[in-house]
Amino acid sequence: VPIEFKRGKGPREGGVWEPDRVQLGAQMLVLRANGYTCDHGWIAYRDARRRERVELSAELATEVLALRDRALELA
């Protein structure tokens, strides 16, 4: 299970910042592509002393792959 440690605090209303969620989603897809079972990960915000579970949903996977494709277009 990937755990991403971040400096600072997460969003005031709870949850995670969108770039952090996408980064963790990409890490989970890489793990899956290499034969690991991975359906969730954690983001821990140091200053808030809390961690949030992030599920690898179909929507997150689609978003990550779309961003990857867009980055490849720009390269």
Stretches with model-predicted labels:
Residues 1-13, 24-29:
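Conserved catalytic cores of phosphodiester-cleaving nucleases, focusing on short active-site segments
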Residues 14, 30-75:
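Metal-dependent nuclease catalytic regions and adjoining charged, substrate-binding loops involved
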Residues 2, 6, 20, 39, ...:
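Amphipathic, alpha-helical segments enriched in basic
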